[in-house]
């Protein structure tokens, strides 16, 4: 199960349910947009318990609509009769202008739509942040890892000698 994080004590409704941490390593994110997501009742209750994974999922524009494909929402134990499919396609809610921008972005070579974070906003509504991303090459990933390691070493040195 995913760990549920809360952003602040003043806002009890805001909760990060699932985060795609690998996306920032594998992709160069150009821009991101907050989208609504159409869910069934048992899916919402399962998300509130923290049972979701968006690491293997992606978003796609099909027939003038935006879909979240291959995202996992764990089954809700108390829903016996009206259980949801764990890996079904879920429709994302977005304005027409943003949809056309996404369509144009995915038509460029190497661009894809990657889910970054799934959360409940301050009003308690389930939202997902979708990023327009370009896949990194192996040498770019190595460069990112080297920068991250160097910043860790710098902070350790400053802590030891500071």
UniProtKB/Swiss-Prot annotation:
Its main location: cytoplasm. This is SsrA-binding protein. Belongs to the SmpB family. HAMAP family: SmpB (MF_00023). The keyword Translocase does not apply. Required for rescue of stalled ribosomes mediated by trans-translation. Binds to transfer-messenger RNA (tmRNA), required for stable association of tmRNA with ribosomes. tmRNA and SmpB together mimic tRNA shape, replacing the anticodon stem-loop with SmpB. tmRNA is encoded by the ssrA gene; the 2 termini fold to resemble tRNA(Ala) and it encodes a 'tag peptide', a short internal open reading frame. During trans-translation Ala-aminoacylated tmRNA acts like a tRNA, entering the A-site of stalled ribosomes, displacing the stalled mRNA. It comes from the Bacteria. It comes from Roseobacter denitrificans (strain ATCC 33942 / OCh 114). The gene is smpB. One of its GO terms (cellular component) is cytosol. Gene3D superfamilies: 2.40.280.10. GO terms for molecular function: RNA binding. Keywords: Cytoplasm, RNA-binding. GO terms for biological process: trans-translation. It is found in: Cytoplasm. InterPro entries: SmpB (IPR023620), SsrA-bd_prot (IPR000037), SsrA-bd_prot_CS (IPR020081). Pfam families: SmpB. Residues 140-162 are annotated as: Disordered.
């Amino acid at each position: 199960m995913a760990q549920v994080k809360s952003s602040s004590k003043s806002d009890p409704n805001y909760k990060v349910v699932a985060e795609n941490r690998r996306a920032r390593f594998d992709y160069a994110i150009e821009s991101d947009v907050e989208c609504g997501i159409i869910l069934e009742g048992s899916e919402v209750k399962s998300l509130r318990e923290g049972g979701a994974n968006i690491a293997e999922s992606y978003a796609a524009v099909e027939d003038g609509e935006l879909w979240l494909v291959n995202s996992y929402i764990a089954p809700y134990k108390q829903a016996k009769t009206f259980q949801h499919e764990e890996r079904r396609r879920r429709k994302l809610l977005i304005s027409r202008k943003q949809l056309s921008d996404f369509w144009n972005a995915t038509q460029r070579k190497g661009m894809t739509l990657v889910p970054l974070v799934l959360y409940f906003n301050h009003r308690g509504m389930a939202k997902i942040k979708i990023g327009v991303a370009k896949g990194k090459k192996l040498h770019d990933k190595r460069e990112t890892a080297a920068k991250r390691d160097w910043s860790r070493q710098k902070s350790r040195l400053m802590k030891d000698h500071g």
